[in-house]
A protein has these predicted regions:
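Conserved N-terminal/central alpha/beta ligand/cofactor-binding core
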Residues: 32-125
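A conserved short coil-to-beta-strand element within the FAD-binding core of flavoproteins
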Residues: 128-135
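Residue-level detector of alpha-helical segments with a strong bias toward transmembrane helices
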Residues: 23, 54-56, 133
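N-terminal Rossmann-like FAD-binding beta1-loop-alpha1 element of flavoenzymes
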Residues: 2-29
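Generic detector of bulky aromatic hydrophobic side chains
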Residues: 6-7, 21, 40-41, 85, ...
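Phosphate-coordination loops involved in phosphoryl transfer and adenosine-cofactor binding
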Residues: 1, 96, 129
Length: 138
């Protein structure tokens, strides 16, 4: 088992840590703030627009100007997989106007709690207040 260090406890960092842990790695997640997902708390006016349920081709044609750049990433882990991930993590979601996906509770804190449950289940080591990052700290 190799050791993986993920720097940053935002949504991308938490997902990266989960993916690495679920692929058999010992993962340490470093976050400079006092809690994970700090900026996520304020997204969507505190509700957290998780994803969009539109067909991927519709999304690419209406939003993206450089479709080729993100095409493979979006199809490797699509919006339905994001919805499934959160529902399996115990977070029920709802589809609102414009195909926007929100937690049923309308609280971004529930999105963060769902991610933290998965991090804990996957035994990811979390180090908060880790602003200075160097080899000696890992």
């Amino acid at each position: 088992m190799s050791r993986v260090v993920v720097i940053g406890g935002g949504p991308a960092g938490m997902f990266a840590a989960i993916a690495a842990a679920e692929n058999g790695h010992h993962v340490t997640l470093l976050e400079k703030n006092e809690k994970l997902g700090k900026k996520l708390f304020i997204t969507g006016k505190g509700r957290c627009n998780i994803t969009n349920s539109s067909d991927m081709d519709v999304l690419f044609n209406s939003v993206m100007t450089n479709r080729k750049f993100l095409y493979s990433a979006f199809y490797a882990y699509d919006n339905q997989m994001v919805i499934d991930f959160f529902e399996q993590a115990g977070l029920p979601v709802k589809n609102e106007r414009g195909n926007r996906i929100f937690p049923v509770s309308d609280h971004s804190s529930d999105v963060i709690a769902a991610l933290q449950r998965v991090l804990k289940k996957d035994q990811v080591e979390i180090r908060l207040h880790s602003e200075e990052i160097g080899r000696a700290h890992v």
